[in-house]
From Swiss-Prot:
The keyword rRNA-binding applies. HAMAP family: Ribosomal_uL5_B. Part of the 50S ribosomal subunit; part of the 5S rRNA/L5/L18/L25 subcomplex. Contacts the 5S rRNA and the P site tRNA. Forms a bridge to the 30S subunit in the 70S ribosome. One of its GO terms (cellular component) is ribosome. Transmembrane segments: none annotated. Belongs to the universal ribosomal protein uL5 family. This is Large ribosomal subunit protein uL5. It comes from Citrobacter koseri (strain ATCC BAA-895 / CDC 4225-83 / SGSC4696). Keywords: Ribonucleoprotein, Ribosomal protein, RNA-binding, rRNA-binding, tRNA-binding. This is one of the proteins that bind and probably mediate the attachment of the 5S RNA into the large ribosomal subunit, where it forms part of the central protuberance. In the 70S ribosome it contacts protein S13 of the 30S subunit (bridge B1b), connecting the 2 subunits; this bridge is implicated in subunit movement. Contacts the P site tRNA; the 5S rRNA and some of its associated proteins might help stabilize positioning of ribosome-bound tRNAs. PANTHER family: 60S RIBOSOMAL PROTEIN L11-RELATED. InterPro entries: Ribosomal_uL5, Ribosomal_uL5_bac-type, Ribosomal_uL5_C, Ribosomal_uL5_CS, Ribosomal_uL5_dom_sf, Ribosomal_uL5_N. GO terms for biological process: translation. GO terms for molecular function: rRNA binding; structural constituent of ribosome; tRNA binding.
């Protein structure tokens, strides 16, 4: 079992119970899933780019990514409905906790010119989204084998009812918010 999951059960739940005066342990917000999304717009011209992006995402997450397709045709972007334009992975359970731990302890501190993550990236319902400009911050990616530096979106979905609860949940994990 991931250390962070044990830490959540032992420490974070008690801390949030006292902070927000919850009546039941089930009211305490928890991390539900983490979604990684990589949009590869250049895949229209070269299908190999999408395969490389999917391989990178598989290495980062430890799970085979789902290829996302265009929902509708857009002439300005030269895409048609059904064209493969990206890939995504939804992590839950044990893999989610392991990824979350690697994200906080290893990957985020390796971001170039890192001064902390914005605390304003909550969606109003306690979910947090962040963008990563380079996939090479993850130790699973071999820098020499990278054909192109790509970014990805990371969304942390929680059961929190408000941004305040979501921020308290992530802060309890020592999430590196900007001061």
């Amino acid at each position: 079992m991931a250390k962070l999951h044990d830490y959540y059960k032992d420490e974070v739940v008690n801390k949030l119970m006292t902070e927000f005066n919850y009546n039941s342990v089930m009211q305490v917000p928890r991390v539900e899933k983490i979604t990684l999304n990589m949009g590869v717009g250049e895949a229209i011209a070269d299908k190999k780019l999408l395969d490389n992006a999917a391989a990178d995402l598989a290495a980062i997450s430890g799970q085979k990514p789902l290829i996302t397709k265009a929902r509708k045709s857009v002439a300005g972007f030269k895409i048609r409905q059904g064209y493969p334009i990206g890939c995504k992975v939804t992590l839950r359970g044990e893999r989610m906790w392991e990824f979350f731990e690697r994200l906080i302890t290893i990957a985020v501190p390796r971001i170039r010119d890192f001064r902390g993550l914005s605390a304003k990236s909550f969606d109003g319902r306690g979910n947090y989204s962040m963008g990563v400009r380079e996939q090479i911050i993850f130790p699973e990616i071999d820098y020499d084998k990278v054909d192109r530096v790509r970014g990805l979106d990371i969304t942390i979905t929680t059961t929190a009812k408000s941004d305040e609860e979501g921020r308290a949940l992530l802060a309890a994990f020592d999430f590196p918010f900007r001061k």
